[in-house]
Amino acid sequence: MWKWKVILLFLAEMFVSGVNGDCACYEANNVTGKSAPISNSYMTEDFSPCYLPCSYVAYSGDETYGWTGLVLNWKTTTNSGGIIQIFDGPSATGTPIIQVAEGETIAAGIGKSLIKSSLPVITIKYSQTGSGASMFILNINNGTFVTNVYYGSISTAAGLAPIAVSTTTTAMPTTRSYSNPNFAYDPYFITHDIFVVINQRTSGGMAALTSLNALAINFVTLLSTTTDINSVSSSRLSLATLTPYDPYYSVQGGIWELSATDVLNNVPRSGVTIEGDIDSALIGLADLAFTVNKNASTDTRNNVQRSVVLLTAEWPSNALLGDNVASKFTELGLNLLVVGYNLTDAETSQLLRTDRWYNAINSSDSKITNVAAFVNPFYFNNGANNFWCPPFGITNSVDGTYSWFQEPYNYTGPHGINGVWTDPFDGQTGRYCNFANNQYVYQNNAGGSVKVQVYFELEAGKDFLNFYDASNNLIASFTGYEIAGSSFFTSTTTLTARFTSDNKSIFRGFWVSITPQP
């Protein structure tokens, strides 16, 4: 707590004093408490509104309490480019976790009101970017001064992990030490609900089954695991084996209750000789463990990726993975990875068919390098052929008046000029992927100005859609959630959009249109 008090005292000297002539900031000093008010500047003699760029720091007073529940209403707007920004931490730097444009109402319990800070300290800032007024605007009709008039507040809520008091001057590391040249990133940070499925039927006997088990074990022991349905990091695990009879699978242990050690102790130790039904088993497991908001112990998490990893040392001719399986997985926002082991050429050709909707790989061994061969391209999204996150290039509209692109490929949010996010996000399907690093390039061949409209729902402060001009200067950045979308204009000859996401929460993504202006 003392470190925040020191910061607040320091910032009290740094930030605007709150007075410019007779115009004063509504909150001229930094605040400590459970609620922080947000309102326009005022004239000291009569409290009439005026404009002053204002900023202050709010501290919850408790390391375990962050900030959320923003509500904001506008009584008067002046088209002067007013903007309210809330930053995570004790300075107005970096990307704000919440940004509210002039005239945008924030209602309690939805949209931006739900965004939470990750620290007990936030910075609240108001500024104007337009030419409406430097101090205020004169209303010629009645001779009074008017400017943007707004009022709101943001409150604290429990939920932050307490910050441990350090006994040394060495800063606590934010990431764990890890170095393995086989992996693009540390597998410990993979955040998925993962159902490992092992096919007990194999013509390779115990040697092949043992290798399948080793692949599964070498994979899950790399992960950080949890059983908490409310967590937004780490992976939850389940395990099943394929069997010859309906429902063609056998769940080993509790669904979403396993650790890596549990998987190690429950992999199959013997095989079966009768062929099962892989398609039916996958559909059944999908329905069993990958629905949201049913208030059941088998519920999947709303804001994480989901995957079934099927390990098999044979690929039977009756395993089609056809439209019925594909539609079920799409309906549930679920991904499939098939890891074959020493499959024949004919089996490999059938599994890796060109029209597949799932990820697949044929492994010749069960070493860490073989695990990396499917973790890197699919879990780390670090490859050109990831069917979980297929690329969606810039596309021309049917009438040729604009170009557009989106992510994910099955984006379900608003489109067009007047689109609005209306449906609450249940987290079942239509979500982007972790570890994204995707680029979209638009060539402004006609020259002149273009209007870029963006609808976005991203993890606030962690996942970003950034736009750059031809000189690679950042000209717009989007994160968090915008109910009615945002837009900007640019005349750059080359417009580059880059989308990046971290390893944690995922949401409904974005839709972008680029329209040449007359």
From Swiss-Prot:
| Secretion signal span | 1-21
- Primary site of residence: secreted
The places in or outside the cell where this protein is found are: Secreted
Q: List all annotated glycosylation positions.
A: N30, N142, N295, N342, N362, N410, N503
Q: Which UniProt keywords apply?
A: Glycoprotein, Secreted, Signal
Domain CUB residues, every copy = 389-517
A GO CC annotation given for this chain: extracellular region
The yes or no answer to whether the keyword Glycoprotein is present is yes
Which InterPro entries does this UniProt record tie to the protein? Sperma_CUB_dom_sf
Task: Decide whether keyword Transmembrane helix is in the record.
Answer: no
Supply the name of the protein: Uncharacterized protein E02H4.4
